[in-house]
Amino acid sequence: MPWRVAVVLPAREGFSPRAVGAIGLQVAALAGRQDVIVGPPLDGPSLLPDHEYRAVQPGLWPPGRRSLRYAAAIARAVAGTGAAVVEVHNRPDTADYVARHRPGQRVLLVLHNDPQGMRGAETPGQRRDLLRLMDVACVSGWVRQRFLDGLPDSCARQVGLSPNGVALPAMAPPMAQRARRVLFAGRVVADKGADLFVAACARLAPTRPDWDFRMIGADRFRTDAPVTPFVSDLRPKATAAGVDMAGYRPHAEVLAAMAQAAIVVVPSRWPEPFGMTALEAMAAGAALIASPVGGLPEVVGNGGLLCAPDPATGLAHAMAGLMDDLPAREDLAARGRAQAARFGIEHARACRAAMRDAALRRGGA
């Protein structure tokens, strides 16, 4: 596309190799040549050194909460970009501020999480007001349904699907050559079921000494993530269960670990809005076990084993079934690779480009 897009990151989203979350990774993966990234100051080199990055800091005006001052700083920053479309990620209040303070500016709000838990989109009335000013792209059908909940059917035309994408490796190590390892990769928090994973491993480790169990992740997506009470409580339990807690690792190392592990487990309690870890695990050729919540079922399809992780006895049973059955792991890995191919980077870029084009041509309702 020949016109420019200003891509706005949330105020706490990193965009450097050693400090980046899921949103930043997808922004980098789907970026167009004309994109300028606008967000908080970087903690290191940019993920996209060939793209312009405009760092913003909340000023003193307008008075009020920090998120309002960040939105005002964003509005000032995008004014000088010459962007035809301002693409705001996961912050309805920021998108609303930009649209209201820059009349005529085309805005696309990209939602990665449940909008009903976001400031400025909690109620149907707020979501309807957003559609008067902008178009909305959702990373999954589940997120889209949550946005449209309580709105008239006529609103659906302005709320589209723009799924996340994954770079599918040309080859994945055969299951028979992989480490006998069960891997958890993600934030080490209760919502992600980190404690359920440890509890399941504790049941399995004594009877399967030829397998090992590993967790990659921390409370936050950065090397200096805080050691929370949850993490402190989990560490001795993980040690007793024989689970290696590796802490935060850069994204490339996480993908490499997925390519080596036989099984990856995504035992989320909360309704995952998409489930990027599950998609990456399937693309890497691991056998996947995931929770049947939120957007995970539509991402996983038949490419993984859907299993409620709570209580952990059920999760342990599902893990044991795959650990003890190489042909089952091989079959699941093959189906996972096929499912992941449906979410390739080029498809994701095409979906995002179509949403940007619609926002430019249509504007608000």
PLM-predicted stretches and their roles:
Residues V88-T94, L111:
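Short His-centered aromatic/hydrophobic patch
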Residues M118-G120, R127-R128, R132-Q158, V166-L168:
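A short, active-site helix/loop in glycosyltransferases that binds the activated sugar's phosphate group
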Residues D135-A137, P174-K192, V198-R203, R214-I216:
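Conserved donor-binding/catalytic core segment of Leloir-type glycosyltransferases
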Residues V227-A252:
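Nucleotide-activated donor-binding/catalytic signature segment of Leloir-type glycosyltransferases, i.e.
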Residues I263, A287-A290:
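Short hydrophobic beta-strand element within catalytic cores of glycosyltransferases
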